[in-house]
Structure formats: C-alpha cells, structure tokens
Amino acid sequence: MKHQMRILQGLKLAAVLAVALSMGACANKNLGAEGAMASAATPGSQQDFVVNVGDRVFFESDQTELSPQAIATLEKQAQWLQSYSRYSFTIEGHADERGTREYNIALGAKRAQSVKSFLSSRGIDPGRMRTISYGKERPVAVCNDISCWSQNRRAVTVLNASS
C-alpha cells in the first residue's frame, strides 16, 4: 500500500512538473501586434517609419492647426526624415464626411500644407515633399459618429520608394 502511495505521489509530481514546463515553454514574450511589428521593422524602412515614428497626425473639426500630439509626431517624423534623406514623400490631407466635397478638398489641402510647413521648419527639404488632398474621398472609418469623423480628419505622410 505504501509503495502504491509513493507511486501515486510521484505521478502527481510528474504531472505538475509536466504542466509547469509546458506552460513555461508556451509562454512566449507576447509583444502584441504592434510590439511584434516594431521588433520586425528594419531601421530606415517604410515599416519602421509607420510603426516606430507614426505616419499620421489628426486635426480637430474644421481645423488646420497642429495639436501638441501632432507636433510631437511631426518632430519624430522630421528626425527620421533627416536620418533617411533618400526618401521623398507625399503628405495626404483628409477630412471627415461632413461638408461639401469642395470644402473638404480645400481643408485637406490646408492640412497637408500645415504638415509640410512644419517639416520644412525643421530642416526637411521642401523639394522632397509633395502634397495632395483627398478631402472626404478616402475615409479610414465610415459611420455617422464622432469616433469615425475624428479618425478621418488627418494628414498622412506616405514615403515614396527610396532611390
């Protein structure tokens, strides 16, 4: 009987150890989608720019003025673009769905120009930049709600293939 108890205790211990080891082996350092992308982004690549710097800034309704958050992102963009001068890029201006097509095209153009002016003031050669406005024609979120509208009021810096 004692022998069977020892065997049973040994089996329990072995089972606990097996579970613990298997859990430890499966415990990868889950970085999440962004962390995994950031660690996989090659420095100086388009993915590096998007993931580690940020390719877009957002605006308040009917505004072209850069917010403190937008300025922080654009400061990082300027540093990155100084380091990787082989890229030319396009600044896309966007607006939410409210307002006329004409109004939103003009607003998107002013937003793109605000970003271009900021980057120029930080030493980025204006010859590397192009601006375009899509107005409300290319929303990233579609719904009749402020949560969607705020995502669509943006300027996106799109890198062109390096030469």
What is the role of each PLM region?
Residues 2-15:
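Bacterial N-terminal signal peptides that target proteins for export
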Residues 21-25:
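C-terminal motif of bacterial Sec signal peptides marking the signal peptidase cleavage site
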Residues 69, 73-76, 102, 110, ...:
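Extracytoplasmic/secreted proteins, especially bacterial periplasmic and envelope-associated proteins
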Residues 147-151:
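A generic structural micro-feature
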Residues 54-56, 102, 154:
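Short, solvent-exposed beta-strand edge segments and adjacent coil->beta transition regions
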Residues 142-145:
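Short beta-alpha junctions and helix-cap segments that line functional grooves
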